[in-house]
Amino acid sequence: VISHGFCESSEKYRELIKTFNKNNYSVYIIDHRGHGKSGRLGIDNSQINVEDFNYYIKDLKTFLDSIVVPNLNDRKLYLFAHSMGGAIGALFLEKHNNYFEKAILNCPMMEIDTGKYPKIVSKIVSKLFCTIGMGNKYLFGHGPFNSKPDFINSATSSRKRYDSYFNKQLEHKELQTSGGSFNWLNQAFKGIKELLKEENIQNIKADVL
């Protein structure tokens, strides 16, 4: 089971899925709410917004219970979770520790890069914006999808992979996610605080890499 990252989608994982398939793994992947072909919750098609970070965990459990588990046929279940999906995956492992035998948390979102703004300031501002009813505003420096390529500031060193996915984004509006809301940031901070609590970490039974 794959849990993708912030502003990503299942479409971005085609190459990895093929690699897993070639090694005899069946693969299931969810588009997290607000991402890919899942419903939008932001002010436009590009914005990632969520009312409660725990909704991601509930969605994943529903996906597992309704789609994945009924097709397991006594096979073991493994998790590959990246970035934001890593935080979702870690919280899931803490709350529901009887699903996965093993898990890979790839660059999990255990902290948030707040850029030029100190983390404490970002926490205060995001909470303030939510309190005064402006939680659905874009984060500073975030905005609607830009149709001009920006490989230099992307999260990959592979130009070929960047161009491949960017071209898909241009062709498919549902892939054009590009920024978060203050609601999302505020909830992400809460989710990270929860997953890093020692008593919650102790609940994990799966082998984790």
Q: What role is predicted for each listed range?
A:
Residues 177-209:
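Conserved serine/cysteine hydrolase catalytic core
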Residues 10-12, 17-43:
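Conserved alpha/beta-hydrolase
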Residues 48-69:
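Alpha/beta-hydrolase active-site loop
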Residues 5-8, 84:
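Active-site glycine-rich loops that stabilize anionic/oxyanionic intermediates
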Residues 71-83:
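Alpha/beta-hydrolase fold nucleophile elbow
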Residues 88-176:
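Alpha/beta-hydrolase-fold enzymes
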